[in-house]
């Protein structure tokens, strides 16, 4: 099937997707989750072929993104069931106002329509995107990377089997099997067929979509995430947080790429950090002040503007909270930043000065995740400010409602007129 034919089929099933009841959507999600487990052998065999073909072609750390295991397939199924358990956003009444002229004005949530997702080598995104689109009454068109085409094909075949077992059209979930740039460009330009485009991947992919798309596009930014260790930090807590944020899964966008350390604790903290990260063979790229304390690779100017997605951490010594915030303003992609401190005033100053989608106090940047926020899997992390910022879920949110307020404690959400809410996540320090 050509991309044009696929888009026609997706558009044709839009009314059916929007008309599904909550019970019907949840039943389909449960069936799709079970189908993933029933077809796990096929999915894992296809994935093994993808991984074998990718070895020597993509970086070893990126193989982790591509790889599936029985546990990861089980996690994909659990994610779909978690989405089924979420409240149905469609039809939610956000506000109601009676006007003096007799009009009753209501704000409600409605589906977007056809959502196209362009992503790279993460087969789990296929299941996550399908689940979120179905729950929100949308049709999805998925276009993954060439490295994962076999895996994605097997996953979509399983999901469609689950849909069709329940009598629903398989075209609720669609996969573009053409992984050429032409197919991606087709989606970017498909006005009248694609109601929303979400790119999820590296800097080049996202920039291409933002620059070229003729359809509405949500920018899901790359993650140059910072952790600032303050003069008033609990240094053991700081070690745990930096270790988790850098090493638990370095190939994901919420992993830390830069550690900023206050000059007053640099001599005590940096040797301990180097020793802790040595076990994971993390390469430290050091500013001159950090290099005067511990050995490592001298940092070049580009190292503080790079999303490494690898066992590499750029380290800089700073003079104050304000100095840290200024560095972040100059180099951050606006994804997730954290401060480790026991000083409430320093934490408040950091949160007020840092302009990113998620800001943490005494917590790992790895918490920027829909599951960790209790909201199920997310479509992506938006770093843009107009209309959509932070964790993104495919429903047309026409006003700030409970779904936004639920995670406003950690995520900056611009409203209109623009205001932001921030807060503390001081209880949980690490994400496993």
Where are the predicted features?
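ALDH superfamily catalytic-core signature
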Residues: 121-124, 128-136, 158, 165, ...
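Rossmann-like NAD(P) dinucleotide-binding subdomain of oxidoreductase/dehydrogenase enzymes
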Residues: 85, 93-236
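N-terminal Rossmann-like NAD(P)+-binding subdomain of aldehyde/semialdehyde dehydrogenases
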Residues: 1-107
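Conserved C-terminal structural/oligomerization subdomain of aldehyde/semialdehyde dehydrogenase
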Residues: 300-432
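Flexible, glycine/charged-enriched surface loops at secondary-structure junctions
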Residues: 22-27, 90, 166-173, 248-255, ...
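A structural signal for short, well-ordered beta-strand elements
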Residues: 18-19, 231, 317, 340
């Amino acid at each position: 099937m050509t991309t044009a034919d696929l888009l026609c089929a997706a558009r044709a099933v839009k009314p059916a997707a929007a008309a599904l009841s909550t019970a019907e959507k949840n039943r389909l999600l449960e069936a799709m989750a079970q189908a993933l487990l029933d077809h796990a052998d096929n999915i894992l065999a296809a994935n093994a072929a993808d991984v074998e073909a990718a070895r020597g072609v993509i970086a070893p750390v990126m193989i982790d993104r591509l790889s599936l295991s029985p546990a990861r397939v089980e996690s994909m199924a659990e994610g779909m069931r978690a989405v089924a358990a979420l409240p149905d956003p469609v039809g939610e009444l956000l506000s109601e106002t009676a006007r003096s002229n007799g009009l009753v004005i209501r704000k409600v949530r409605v589906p977007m329509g056809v959502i196209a997702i362009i992503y790279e080598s993460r087969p789990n995104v296929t299941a996550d995107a399908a689940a979120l689109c179905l729950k929100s009454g949308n049709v999805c068109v998925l276009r993954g990377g060439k490295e994962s085409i076999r895996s994605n094909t097997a996953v979509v075949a399983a999901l469609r089997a689950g849909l069709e077992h329940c009598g629903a059209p398989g075209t609720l979930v669609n996969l573009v099997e053409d992984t050429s740039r032409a197919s991606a460009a087709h989606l970017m330009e498909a006005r009248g067929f694609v109601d929303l485009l979400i790119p999820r991947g590296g800097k080049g992919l996202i920039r291409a979509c933002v620059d070229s798309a003729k359809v509405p596009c949500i920018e899901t930014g790359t993650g140059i995430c910072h952790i600032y260790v303050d003069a008033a930090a609990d240094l053991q807590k700081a070690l745990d947080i930096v270790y988790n944020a850098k090493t638990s899964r370095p190939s994901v966008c919420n992993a830390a790429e830069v550690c900023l350390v206050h000059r007053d604790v640099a001599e005590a903290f940096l040797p301990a950090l180097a020793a802790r990260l040595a076990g994971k063979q993390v390469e430290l790229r050091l500013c001159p002040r950090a290099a005067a304390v511990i050995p490592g690779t001298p940092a070049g100017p580009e190292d503080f503007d790079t999303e490494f997605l690898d066992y590499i951490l750029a380290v800089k010594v700073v003079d104050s909270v304000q100095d840290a915030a200024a560095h972040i303003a100059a180099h951050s992609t606006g994804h997730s930043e954290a401060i480790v401190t026991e000083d409430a005033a320093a934490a408040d100053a950091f949160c007020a000065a840092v302009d990113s989608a998620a800001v943490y106090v005494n917590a790992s940047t790895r918490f920027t995740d829909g599951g960790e926020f209790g909201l199920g899997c997310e479509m992506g992390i938006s770093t843009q400010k107009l209309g959509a910022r932070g964790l993104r879920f495919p429903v047309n949110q026409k006003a700030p409602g409970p779904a936004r307020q639920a995670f406003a404690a950690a995520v900056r959400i611009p409203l209109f007129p623009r205001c932001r809410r921030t807060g503390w996540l001081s209880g949980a320090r690490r994400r496993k």
